[in-house]
Structures are given as C-alpha cells and as structure tokens.
From Swiss-Prot:
Annotated NCBIfam families: circ_KaiB, PRK09301.1
Keyword Aminoacyl-tRNA synthetase appears in the UniProt entry: no
Domain of life: Bacteria
InterPro entries in the record: Circ_KaiB, KaiB-like, KaiB_domain, Thioredoxin-like_sf
Record keywords, A-Z: Biological rhythms
Organism encoding this protein: Rippkaea orientalis (strain PCC 8801 / RF-1)
Subunit structure: The KaiABC complex composition changes during the circadian cycle to control KaiC phosphorylation. Complexes KaiC(6), KaiA(2-4):KaiC(6), KaiB(6):KaiC(6) and KaiC(6):KaiB(6):KaiA(12) are among the most important forms, many form cooperatively. Undergoes a major conformational rearrangment; in the free state forms homotetramers as a dimer of dimers. When bound to the CI domain of KaiC switches to a monomeric thioredoxin-fold (KaiB(fs)). KaiB(fs) binds CikA, leading it to dephosphorylate phospho-RpaA.
Lineage of origin: Bacteria, Bacillati, Cyanobacteriota, Cyanophyceae, Oscillatoriophycideae
Cystine residue pairs: none
Domain notes: Has 2 forms, fold switches to a thioredoxin-like fold (KaiB(fs)) when bound to KaiC.
Gene3D superfamilies named among the record's database cross-references: Glutaredoxin
Record-given protein name: Circadian clock oscillator protein KaiB
Biological process annotations from GO: circadian rhythm
Cited function: Key component of the KaiABC oscillator complex, which constitutes the main circadian regulator in cyanobacteria. Complex composition changes during the circadian cycle to control KaiC phosphorylation. KaiA stimulates KaiC autophosphorylation, while KaiB sequesters KaiA, leading to KaiC autodephosphorylation. Phospho-Ser-431 KaiC accumulation triggers binding of KaiB to form the KaiB(6):KaiC(6) complex, leading to changes in output regulators CikA and SasA. KaiB switches to a thioredoxin-like fold (KaiB(fs)) when bound to KaiC. A metamorphic protein which reversibly switches between an inactive tetrameric fold and a rare, thioredoxin-like monomeric fold (KaiB(fs)). KaiB(fs) binds phospho-KaiC, KaiA and CikA. KaiA and CikA compete for binding to KaiB(fs), and KaiB(fs) and SasA compete for binding to KaiC, thus the clock oscillator and output signal pathway are tightly coupled.
Family that this chain belongs to: Belongs to the KaiB family.
Amino acid sequence: MVNFKKTYVLKLYVAGNTPNSVRALKTLKNILEDEFKGVYALKVIDVLKNPQLAEEDKILATPTLSKILPPPVRKIIGDLSDREKVLIGLDLLYEEIRERESEL
C-alpha cells in the first residue's frame, strides 16, 4: 500500500523586513522543517509590497500565518514563537496525533 503524505500550504503575511517579521519567518521555518520537512509549501507575502493580497485575504495585522491546505483554513495572528501554540492554532498538532492513533 502506498502512503501519500499530505501537503501543507501556508501563507505568512509580514510587514516589511522588520525584526518582528524576520523572527516570525525564522521561527516558522524551524517549526516546519522539524515537523513537516518535505511536505509543506510556504509563501511569504509582504503586505507593504502587496497590499491587495492582504485585502483579498482579509489580513488586518502582521505577522499573520494562514494554513490554506488541508482544510479548514486556520489563522494565527501575532507571536509565532511558541511551537506548540502554533501547531495547535493551525490544527496541525491534533491532526498528526489523530493520524498516528488511527494507524494503531
């Protein structure tokens, strides 16, 4: 049986190259590489350069992390430094636990 892994599609909205934006991106990349290496796509959107994208996606504050796929869409606004809160907020931690339990 072939086991296809899900691909996680995420968007990180930042406002320029501020220390807060750089920290959010670095922290997020660490989490994704540790937990979802090879099965994620991350798009970083600078709302100062692309305000229309922020408006279309109803982004009101930065940094905002949005999980697009797999559904449902989830968003985290603000501090991304707490690994567990990020995973829980995006419904990724519980999803992985459920999958592991179903394999038992």
